[in-house]
Amino acid sequence: VMVFQPLPEGAHRAVLPGYNYPYHEAIDFYHHYKEDIALFAEMGFKVFRMSIAWTRIYPNGVEETPNQAGLDFYRNVFLELKKYGIEPLVTIQHYDVPLYLEETFGGWKNRRLIELFDRYTETLSGIQGPGEILADLQ
């Protein structure tokens, strides 16, 4: 099933001033995760459900090497959670297949995605070289 639906040719997504929520960066967890996690701990959270974006690790899904900045970000989030005794509950694919894979291969309809997804998960689990962001946080 293709979750991403491209717009018809010539159409543009509209962000109407004053109509949509005015702050388009949402909670900006990427820049505020340390403060957010400290607040979670203050509220007594023991588990934090989060997703890892495939595109933050392999932006197009077909790169030869993972994006080190993405790996570092998640490693830092996990270490911050560990510091406060909060266990991460991680989703590794949440309807966010890289757009390039949707456009080039048709998404999950193409078996090539199994190989690419396998490489992505190996990177996350530390099996594939420098991407060991989950393995050493036990």
Tell me the role of every PLM-derived stretch.
Residues 2-38, 43:
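Aromatic- and Gly/Pro-rich amphipathic surface segment
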Residues 37-138:
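Substrate-binding cleft and catalytic face of glycoside hydrolase catalytic domains
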